[in-house]
Amino acid sequence: MTNPDCSLLSMPKTSAPLPLTAETIAIGTELLIGGRSDSNSLFLADELCKLGITVRFKSVVGDERQDIVTALHSAVKRARVIIMTGGLGPTVDDCTREAVAQATGHRLGRRKEALEGMTARLAQWGRRPNTGQLRQALIPSGAVVLKNPVGSAPGFCLRWKKALIISLPGVPREMEEMMCQEVLPLLRAEGLASGGFPREPIVRQVFHTFGLAEADVDAKLQGLIPKGAPVDLGMLASPMGVLVSLTTKGRQSAPDNNRHLLQTLADGVRSRLGDWLFAEGRDTMEEVVGRELTKRGLVLALAESCTGGLIGHRLTQVAGSSAYVDRGAVCYSNRAKTEMLGVPADLIDQYGAVSKEVAAAMACGIRARAKVAVGLSVTGIAGPGGGTDKKPVGLVYIGLDGGTGQPITQEFRFHGDRNVIKQRSSQAALDILRRWLLEKA
């Protein structure tokens, strides 16, 4: 944060803490026409809940100045913290700065600290600012400039009426870094200035499952929450599994008791879900698998067909994965399976490329060629075409060879479009590997 103006944070102190309410405004026409999903608001809601700030409303507007102005006029009537994401780039449709200035009656002006920060960032990339990028240094008068540690577009915050407006870039990585480094300290100060946050911030624990339908997870957790307990149980299904959440309900009168209750309920979730539970918090399946491979000193090789390298991509997104991922082969055609993995052509002719026999041969083949501890394979029909009555779209076989001479294979029947089937196939393959690793403990 650059030279914060303490007047931005000053609010009359009260005898009891007042709950801070928030609204998020996601800006971008692509969010309204199916081009992109709004992941920023989910991240913001999670971070705000940790502070005890309740998100009451969420708006999504296109790249139209007047629409943004209208959204701000609505938000200021019902929220004390307004966080906007998007519209701070260098192109003509990036008009958040102009919209905030128009709505609040502030003038736009080029700020030295914003220009210097942007110029320094571009210089690191071997570039100089063009006319469009110079617009990113325009900041409403009276606003505090928020530094962007990873991108070129600075953010800003300013007081308008009884609300604090915070404007951040829409690029998720930039927004998240700025939220953590610039905005959260600002909001903590905001809470102190108004007499403190509610006594107990909203606490949320998240659990990730795979292999059970949402209805099955619900059945396992029936009766877990005592009647009248100040905790909500939530579930959200996705191609990656079912997410289960425990969330405390707003301001609590006995925080220690509620923390103890939440921990007791969390233990209940773990006990009831057992091995179906693969991670908690922000952990992903690929991170969990990576830790288990590292713990055992094992190295993996992959042979992928219908997933097209997705499993390898996910695993290598984790820093340090070179310690346990040796190689991956995308063997889409029958010829590739034979030439690269040594799968016998007559085996493919007899059982078909999508079969448990070929999945096993693929896993054994990649493991033997890589000379590693584990070979993991996947073959299937992702669709939309290629299915038959006997082998429909969504049929997937996964193979694992751990060097015992008896490879493991498992059949799945997934539903959804091509992308969903690929995602579920990659998750299922990693889950089979996870369970195999746990058995070796």
Residue ranges and their predicted role:
Residues 45, 49-74, 110-151, 336-374:
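Glycine-rich oxoanion-binding loops at beta->alpha junctions
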Residues 17-59, 258-260:
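Glycine-rich phosphate/diphosphate-binding loop of Rossmann-like nucleotide-binding domains
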Residues 159-240, 245-247, 257-262:
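Accessory alpha-helical/coil subdomains and C-terminal extensions
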Residues 12-35, 299-303, 307-312, 320:
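A short, flexible N-terminal coil/short beta segment enriched in small residues
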Residues 27-29, 84-92, 169-170, 249, ...:
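Glycine-rich beta-strand-to-loop/alpha-helix junction loops that act as flexible
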Residues 255-441:
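Short alpha-helical segments enriched in small residues
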Residues 67-73, 77, 94-191:
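Proline/glycine-rich low-complexity loops and linkers
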